[in-house]
A protein has these predicted regions:
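Cytosolic-side transmembrane-helix boundaries in multi-pass membrane proteins
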Residues: 1-22, 280-320
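N-terminal signal-anchor module of multipass membrane proteins
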Residues: 1-53, 57
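C-terminal ends of transmembrane helices
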Residues: 10, 58-70, 106-118, 193-201, ...
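Alpha-helical transmembrane segments in multi-pass membrane proteins
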Residues: 25-33, 48-60, 77-82, 86, ...
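Structural signature of hydrophobic alpha-helical transmembrane segments
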Residues: 42-55, 92-101, 174, 178-188, ...
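Membrane-interface helix-loop-helix junctions at boundaries between adjacent transmembrane segments
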Residues: 78, 83-151
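Long hydrophobic alpha-helical segments that form multi-pass transmembrane helix bundles
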Residues: 118-192
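Loop-to-transmembrane alpha-helix initiation sites
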Residues: 120, 124, 234-241, 263, ...
Length: 320
């Protein structure tokens, strides 16, 4: 009888989606943006993607080997970090800087804080911001030459809007991806296809990206360089890393709130900060720093947004 009633320790109810399965879903969802980036920028984009992924996976394996910790590279989280970081890099970036960004993202941002589930900021964004600070010139070099011919030369659409106005860009090209930019941010259509895949697979819900995008749109409509201009707002939405950040980085399970209201507040914070950086900052972008700063606010957001337990009454009422 004792064998009949012997049970293992909890948990007894398990979801079908493990970490590696979720990470695989994210990789699949990033394929449209990755493939378009390779098509748009050539095989050097593929080289940067593979190199950055290899850098992240190798960094995680080496760190865990040194500290005698069980290897976690099979959960694919390092692959996702490497892929996201690569999609946030300009294709002309020197290869060793891409490697350095991957090492920083994994060892400093992720492993030094205890590994997956313990990091306070998105590792890919941490790696990108490190490279932006350390190698600003290379991270803002979007000149692309193929077979001696300039494919893309000059500023990104956001820089053109900031410096020359809305008439200097074509929103249709921004939707398709025929613009300068990082490997994975140029095609809004490819990013949205990936976002739909993640939504259908249940990887993310729309609370964070929707509140992020709506808040940013309202902010730019009210305070942007061309106030009350819908076309200007659409161009700002399509430019830069907003869509990639809203759907693939702000929704990171580890660094975003878990409560429904917390997710909305977090998205609002991201939207406001991105708007502030774009309107009043020296750089035309702002998504990476906005999400990282919002990551730092997550503990406070969780505290103020946690639902009250059923039956709990406020202290003031208990004393009455």
């Amino acid at each position: 009888m004792s064998d009949l009633f012997h049970v293992s320790s909890s948990p007894h109810v398990r979801a079908k989606d493990s970490t590696d399965r979720i990470m695989l879903y994210v990789i699949i969802a990033l394929l449209p943006a990755s493939l378009f980036g390779i098509y748009n920028f050539g095989f050097r984009a593929l080289f940067i993607i593979l190199l950055t992924i290899a850098s992240c996976v190798a960094s995680e394996w080496v760190f865990e080997y040194i500290v005698k910790k069980k290897s976690t590279i099979t959960d694919l989280s390092a692959v996702v970090t490497g892929l996201l970081l690569a999609l946030n890099l300009p294709v002309a970036l020197p290869w060793w800087e891409a490697v350095l960004g991957g090492v920083f993202a994994i060892i400093i941002v992720k492993c030094m804080f205890g590994g997956l589930g313990q990091n306070f900021m998105n590792p890919a964004l941490g790696g990108r911001c490190f490279l932006l600070i350390a190698f600003a010139a290379d991270m803002t070099n979007f000149n692309v030459t193929r077979n001696g011919v300039d494919v893309y030369s000059g500023a990104t659409p956001l820089a053109l809007i900031k410096n020359e106005g809305l008439s200097s860009v074509n929103v249709r090209d921004m939707l398709i991806g025929n613009t300068a930019g990082t490997i994975g941010e140029t095609s809004v259509i490819a990013i949205l296809i990936g976002a739909i895949i993640m939504i259908l697979l249940g990887v993310i819900d729309l609370k964070i990206p929707a509140s992020y995008i709506i808040t940013f749109a309202v902010f730019m409509f009210l305070f942007g360089a061309q106030q009350f201009d819908i076309n200007y707002v659409v161009a700002e939405l399509c430019g830069g890393g907003l869509m990639l950040g809203a759907f693939f980085m702000a929704t990171d399970y580890v660094t975003s709130p878990i409560t429904p209201m917390g997710k909305i507040i977090f998205g609002i914070c991201c939207g406001i900060l991105t708007g502030v950086f774009r309107c009043f900052g020296a750089n035309a972008e702002g998504v990476s720093f906005a999400i990282i700063l919002s990551n730092c606010l997550v503990p406070i957001i969780e505290k103020v947004s946690i639902p009250r337990a059923f039956g709990m009454v406020k202290e003031a009422k208990k004393n009455e």
